[in-house]
């Protein structure tokens, strides 16, 4: 293939590139058509299409489902076998995800690469998944051109009237192999003998038109010849092109944003909010309507939050809610979804309150002011793959929206691994497609076992390159506040992966003052205050919850010759800041990298990659195939060994 005209690092094969255009209908109306870029991981793009459409419905069309429609083209083998199809179809009537119905076009060529359809599904039809939502299915002969056109029009009318999914099963065949180099006669010799003898749909339709007296054979032959000449002319033109120009998908939406350099991602961004404004918004979201009755514990939660403001000691949830509230007041849109997200897995957020003895919900963040931006929060169905794909698509179309997907526990992110690998980490490098999706992945070693401890930080760090995303482990409410606000207040749009806390949500040390939210910005590094740097003999770098365990041991034992540095941003790693801190401590005997995770996990190998000359000594749990142990006493023993190794001259076994 030819080189790209733009500075895309790698690009992609032509089959995967997206496209946009505006066409004029026979009635003179202009319609915008968008073809999503998509990988060879079949059916993944369907979730993104749903998210894109819902985003436009929310932000551009004021909830009108008739202004935009999703169309998803499937293969018969894929729609019958890929689990994400079921996840996405289950969304179709859910309040947080419905798009007014999808047109599903199934190109049923009765073979999946080399697999016969009898080996590809147990159901009679490839479209039997439509029974889940009782959607109509039209089975159409692929040789009957007019029947296909009629069915597509009928399906669209049905969709517009009933706002439900419609399936069109086009029974047809694949004339050649799976790709240019494939020989189908190896595996389907009988089928391809039949296909060889079968007239193509164009000739069948030409014969029909001739029989009707609509067009003569000579006229259709002439039309075919004219079209062949047109194609040949375009081919000749393409030969003169030296470099391919990849038309950037959604270019218009991202004109104000740039592909970031490393400098862009470590420059301070002003994210503070005036104190009076913070207090006003806090008052609004901590006030329940007097005409509604709430569960007593809800009243207590709200009262506790009011006291936080008065005591000037805000916890994680309060800072998080204020981040959303301030963005909403600035006119941005905020959308947050995931399993149990309204309340929060750990009952910390309470973004909605249920009115007692009813199903009515009250959303404080929807009631800040009449001029605020839209706030959406939804509990998703029990899906990671489909929902993450949806939220990625949602965030694509509106760079002024803070779109967040939260995992119930960070451990479950890998159910959606395809979305991370094929889209979140690589879409810009392949397709020039920007995105600012935020992910909340609860992470922390607290003795809850291998399924509820690790969001596998190492996996995300392994995907980092070319400033493609941010990987962050904030440890203070203020830093979380500034981090969330930064995502919309700088002129770049890249994904943000946040490893959020669990036990720290209510930790007495994990609080921030109103001034810390009002002033300052996100801190990539947080240093402990040291009055006499010359006395320090151990310099400990760490991140996440382990900092508070280290701090507690240090305070209990009155240790003065050790200082602890929190690395809040793991990518882009603040290399210059780390080196500058090391240079300050002239008498240090040991530079330690301490982490809760096993040595083959966490950030250790990532740090070695970017700081190979720094003589770090690793203190962590031993290398392990499983991310965490399942016994509390074992967990506590390992933690004690880490702390002992940091503060005493002991070797971690």
Predicted feature residues:
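Thiamine diphosphate
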Residues: 99-217, 221-225, 433-434, 445-456, ...
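Conserved internal helical-beta-strand scaffold that buttresses enzyme catalytic cores
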Residues: 1-71, 77-84, 89-102, 108-118, ...
């Amino acid at each position: 293939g030819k080189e790209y005209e733009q500075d895309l690092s790698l690009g992609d094969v032509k089959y995967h590139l997206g496209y946009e255009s505006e066409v004029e209908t026979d009635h003179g109306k202009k319609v915008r058509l968008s073809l999503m870029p998509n990988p060879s991981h079949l059916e993944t793009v369907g979730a993104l299409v749903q998210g894109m459409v819902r985003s436009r419905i929310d932000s551009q069309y004021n909830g009108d489902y008739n202004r935009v429609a999703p169309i998803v083209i499937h293969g018969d083998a894929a729609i019958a076998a890929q689990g994400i199809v079921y996840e996405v179809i289950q969304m179709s009537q859910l309040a947080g995800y419905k798009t007014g119905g999808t047109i599903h076009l199934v190109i049923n060529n009765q073979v999946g690469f080399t697999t016969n359809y009898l080996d590809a599904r147990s159901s009679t039809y490839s479209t039997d998944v439509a029974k889940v939502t009782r959607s109509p299915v039209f089975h159409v002969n692929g040789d009957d051109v007019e029947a296909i056109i009629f069915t597509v029009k009928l399906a669209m009318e049905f969709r517009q009237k009933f706002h439900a999914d419609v399936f069109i099963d086009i029974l047809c065949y694949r004339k050649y192999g799976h790709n240019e180099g494939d020989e189908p006669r190896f595996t389907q010799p009988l089928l391809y003998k039949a296909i060889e003898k079968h007239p193509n749909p164009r000739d069948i339709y030409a014969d029909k038109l001739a029989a009707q007296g609509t067009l003569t054979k000579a006229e259709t032959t002439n039309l075919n010849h004219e079209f062949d000449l047109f194609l040949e002319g375009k081919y000749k033109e393409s030969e003169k092109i030296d470099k391919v120009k990849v038309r950037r998908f959604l270019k218009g939406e991202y004109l104000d944003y740039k592909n970031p350099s490393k400098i862009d991602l470590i420059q301070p961004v002003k994210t503070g909010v005036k104190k009076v404004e913070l207090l006003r918004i806090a008052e609004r979201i901590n006030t329940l309507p007097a005409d509604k009755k709430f569960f007593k514990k809800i009243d207590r939660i709200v009262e506790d939050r009011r006291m936080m403001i008065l005591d000037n000691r805000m916890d994680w949830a309060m800072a998080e809610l204020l981040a959303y509230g301030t963005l909403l007041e600035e006119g941005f849109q905020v959308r947050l979804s995931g399993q149990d997200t309204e309340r929060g897995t750990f009952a910390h957020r309470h973004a909605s309150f249920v009115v007692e003895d009813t199903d009515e919900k009250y959303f404080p963040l929807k009631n800040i002011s009449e001029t605020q931006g839209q706030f959406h929060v939804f509990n998703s169905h029990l899906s990671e793959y489909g929902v993450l794909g949806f939220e990625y698509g949602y965030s694509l179309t509106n760079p002024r929206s803070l779109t967040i997907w939260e995992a119930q526990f960070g451990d479950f992110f890998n159910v959606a691994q395809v979305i991370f690998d094929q889209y979140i980490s690589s879409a810009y490098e392949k397709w020039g497609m920007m995105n600012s999706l935020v992910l909340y992945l609860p992470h922390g070693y607290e003795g809850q076992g291998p399924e509820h401890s690790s969001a596998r930080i190492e996996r995300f760090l392994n995907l980092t390159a070319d400033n493609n995303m941010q990987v962050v482990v904030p440890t203070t409410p203020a830093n979380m506040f500034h981090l969330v606000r930064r995502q919309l207040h700088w002129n770049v749009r890249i994904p943000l992966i946040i490893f959020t806390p669990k036990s720290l949500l209510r930790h007495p040390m994990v609080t921030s003052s109103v001034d810390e939210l009002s002033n300052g910005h996100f801190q990539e590094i947080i240093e402990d205050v040291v009055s006499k740097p010359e006395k320090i003999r151990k310099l400990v770098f760490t991140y996440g919850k382990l900092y508070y365990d280290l701090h507690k041991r240090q305070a209990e034992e009155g240790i003065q010759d050790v200082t602890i540095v929190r690395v809040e941003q793991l990518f882009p790693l603040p290399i210059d800041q780390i080196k500058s801190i090391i240079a300050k401590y002239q008498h240090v005997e040991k530079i330690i990298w301490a982490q809760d995770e096993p040595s083959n996990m966490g950030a250790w190998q990532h740090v070695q990659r970017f700081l190979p000359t720094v003589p770090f000594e690793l203190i962590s749990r031993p290398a392990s195939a499983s991310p965490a142990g399942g016994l509390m006493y074992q967990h506590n023993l390992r933690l004690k060994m880490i702390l002992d190794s940091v503060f005493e001259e002991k070797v971690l076994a």
